[in-house]
């Protein structure tokens, strides 16, 4: 499979693809002002477009390379490769839904605040994970609880 297709999408990669630098907060700047909202809107839209392109590329790749190999081992290898591609496609599709939810939060002026405690999530955390809906403290607590539940 092509190397380009196997690249992992990261928020830093999305920043560079969007042609953006990390946001430089100004002194006494209000949290989630117009500039910050625009910054994250561009990041999310670019990320969504990139994921949609990858999904389309996966479908085209599978359609173009679907061959009925006479050798069962070759056929099994191809099926496993396609299975991995489809699993990645499904993961991307779920991430697109999270991005769309986050874009909706931006439109509703509810972006950047923790769903649990309503505190500011923070610019750097949102740049690292633009779809974050919990502040670092609430996320840490949730992970500790999850770890305790699973043992």
Curated annotation (Swiss-Prot):
The keyword Zinc-finger applies. GO terms for biological process: regulation of gene expression. PROSITE patterns: ZF_DKSA_1, ZF_DKSA_2. GO terms for cellular component: cytoplasm. Keywords: Cytoplasm, Metal-binding, Zinc, Zinc-finger. Its main location: cytoplasm. InterPro entries: DksA_N (IPR048489), DksA_RNA_pol-bd (IPR012784), DnaK_N (IPR037187), Znf_DskA_TraR (IPR000962), Znf_DskA_TraR_CS (IPR020458). Belongs to the DksA family. NCBIfam families: dksA. Transcription factor that acts by binding directly to the RNA polymerase (RNAP). Required for negative regulation of rRNA expression and positive regulation of several amino acid biosynthesis promoters. Also required for regulation of fis expression. This is RNA polymerase-binding transcription factor DksA. It comes from Buchnera aphidicola subsp. Acyrthosiphon pisum (strain APS).
